[in-house]
């Protein structure tokens, strides 16, 4: 959430920044409601003070045995006025909060402007052994009899997958490898619920805007779209001591997404699923450290691709392609020979104080309070890593080779990849 006082003071600046992110709301109306709410608040405080004075006068008159009827009538009139004003205040407060929760974060000043992904900026390409073309991961998995699309469709419909044997073991090995990498970089591992309440999704920014992409299980509960939601919301309505930051958290979870806006896109295989595995990294840092923390987050994720010897590139997203809550995002895109292009495998974002304001998470040194900055990123999306390994290291008649160290490990044999 953006501080409404800042919006009021820098209205033209916020209009321009939010317009670059595709925001279509009326900031003038938001500021007008904010001013009206403040005006009512001042009036309420004045009348409540008058009523308190009147109550004391009534008490004094009563002690003296003098008439209090006129004063009581005045007090009742003030009570009625307070009730009406309080109702107006509550309505405005609710409307203002709803609008503020629907306003996206503004892009950082160094984020390139643009309407869509065509304006994204490639920062770096890292190339290893790279096939220019080849079969896709579904064909490879079915040839190896380790991926069963028909079974997944029978069980759950489209955008699901069944893995078995060595491929299921490889996925488990990748998860362990990624968690070990996170631990070596100072992240504390968490096990978190896979079902969260609406307040949690409001805190990180998935609600209210992206309600259609969430899997609701009823009674205000949802399946998590990413471990970012439970990890970050652990500190909702909490005060964090400056002595305890940076806080670095990680979790492996399944993630659930309705993919409401992607009908017909990537329906084959593991590119875009309703259920997928991911290792998430989350940071709480001092505001002065968040830019450096984003670079470190990207490095933590890209180092995994380096160790797996998968070709990738770093891409900074333009303003129009940024997520709702993000101030700046750097994607890692892995090379997929079957598509002859790079596809996203990690998205690392700096949210600044956008999420902590929504969650009412404070940073305190004992005397003053501010809002810490949050960051998160995937390290990595497990399914997309798995399919990238399949496509980049598949050799007909041999199987799929995964390099997690200088020595190759053959997934068609008994040895599995590890972080060693």
What are these regions (language model features)?
Residues 208-225, 338-341:
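Acidic, His- and aromatic-enriched active-site or binding-groove loops in soluble protein domains
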Residues 1-126:
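N-terminal alpha-helical targeting/anchoring segments
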Residues 403-410:
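Conserved small/polar residues in nucleotide/adenosyl-binding loops
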Residues 77-216:
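TRNA-binding/sensing appendages of the translation machinery
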Residues 414-420:
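Hydrophobic alpha-helical segments, chiefly the membrane-spanning helices
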């Amino acid at each position: 959430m953006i501080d409404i006082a800042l919006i009021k003071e820098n209205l033209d600046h916020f209009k321009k920044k939010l317009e670059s992110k595709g925001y279509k709301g009326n900031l003038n109306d938001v500021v007008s409601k904010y001013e009206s709410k403040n005006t009512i608040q001042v009036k309420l405080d004045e009348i409540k003070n008058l009523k308190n004075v009147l109550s004391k006068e009534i008490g004094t008159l009563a002690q003296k045995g003098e008439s209090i009827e006129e004063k009581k009538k005045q007090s009742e009139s003030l009570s009625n006025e307070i009730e009406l004003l309080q109702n107006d205040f509550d309505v405005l407060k609710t409307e203002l909060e709803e609008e503020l929760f629907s306003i996206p974060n503004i892009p950082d000043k160094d984020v390139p402007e643009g309407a869509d992904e065509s304006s994204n900026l490639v920062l770096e390409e890292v190339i290893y052994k790279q096939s220019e073309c080849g079969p896709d991961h579904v064909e490879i998995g079915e040839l190896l009899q380790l991926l069963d699309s028909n079974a997944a469709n029978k069980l759950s419909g489209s955008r699901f997958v069944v893995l078995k044997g060595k491929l299921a073991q490889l996925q488990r090995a990748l998860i362990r490898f990624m968690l070990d990498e996170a631990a070596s970089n100072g992240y504390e591992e968490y096990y978190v619920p896979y079902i969260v309440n609406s307040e949690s999704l409001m805190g990180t920014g998935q609600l209210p805007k992206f309600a259609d992409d969430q899997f609701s299980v009823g009674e205000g509960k949802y399946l998590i779209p990413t471990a970012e939601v439970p990890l970050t919301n652990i500190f909702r309505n909490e005060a964090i001591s400056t002595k305890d930051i940076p806080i670095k958290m990680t979790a492996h979870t399944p993630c659930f997404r309705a993919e409401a806006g992607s009908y017909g896109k990537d329906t084959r295989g593991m590119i875009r699923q309703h259920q997928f595995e991911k290792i998430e990294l989350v940071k709480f840092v001092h505001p002065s450290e968040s830019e450096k923390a984003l670079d470190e987050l990207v490095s933590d994720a890209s180092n995994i691709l380096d160790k797996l010897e998968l070709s990738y590139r770093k891409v900074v997203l333009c303003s129009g392609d940024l997520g709702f809550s993000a101030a700046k995002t750097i994607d890692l895109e892995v090379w997929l020979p079957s598509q002859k292009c790079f596809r996203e495998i990690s998205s690392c974002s700096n949210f600044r104080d956008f999420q902590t304001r929504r969650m009412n998470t404070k940073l305190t040194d004992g005397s003053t309070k501010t809002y810490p900055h949050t960051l998160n990123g995937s390290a990595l999306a497990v399914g997309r890593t798995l399919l990238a390994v399949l496509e980049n290291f598949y050799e007909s008649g041999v199987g799929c080779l995964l390099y997690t160290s200088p020595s190759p490990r053959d997934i068609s044999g008994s040895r599995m990849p590890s972080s060693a």
